[in-house]
């Protein structure tokens, strides 16, 4: 949120050279300041305190994803959404039952209506405060209801996670 023109310009400049791209949200805007919601457990706690509840963090994350999907990023805009439940990265410490979250239902319906596909990745399995894939539980059930295409991914930011697909078999 707030960097749409810069993103669109970069996509217009480099989009023709990209085989694949993913639209994802890591930063959320509170008032006029940006916070990286998946940087650290301490940063996530700071965001919870600023917004007043874990539920409010989830809602703002989903609202930001809705804005990203609705934004005009040009003809090279990614058609896949990354780690849709990244907000759960610290769910072991910040528990929240999101099964009745209206914003999440609105988001999944929008993804379906717009024909997006979703990144189903295993990175969360290896995060000590997460322990689940970045599409699991209630969200996975909701996605199945809407018959949204999933694309397997590792979200590997280092070589040690590239070969972790055996773990994924347990979750499919």
Regions found by a protein language model. Give the residues of each.
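Extended substrate/RNA-proximal surfaces in nucleic-acid metabolism proteins
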Residues: 1-113
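Charged catalytic cores and adjacent phosphate/nucleic-acid-binding surfaces used
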Residues: 94-172
């Amino acid at each position: 949120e707030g960097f749409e023109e810069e993103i669109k310009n970069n996509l217009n400049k480099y989009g023709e050279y990209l085989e694949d791209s993913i639209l994802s949200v890591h930063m959320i805007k509170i008032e006029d300041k940006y916070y990286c919601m998946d940087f650290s457990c301490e940063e996530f706690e700071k965001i919870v305190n600023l917004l007043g509840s874990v539920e409010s963090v989830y809602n703002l994350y989903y609202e930001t994803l809705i804005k990203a999907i609705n934004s005009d990023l040009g003809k090279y805009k990614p058609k896949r959404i990354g780690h849709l439940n990244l907000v759960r990265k610290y769910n072991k410490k910040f528990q929240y039952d999101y099964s009745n979250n209206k914003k999440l239902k609105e988001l999944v319906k929008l993804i379906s209506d717009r024909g997006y596909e979703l990144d189903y990745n295993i990175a969360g399995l290896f995060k000590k405060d997460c322990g689940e894939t970045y599409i699991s539980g209630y969200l996975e059930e909701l996605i199945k209801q809407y018959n949204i295409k999933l694309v397997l991914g590792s979200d590997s930011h280092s070589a040690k996670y590239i070969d972790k697909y055996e773990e994924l078999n347990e979750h499919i």
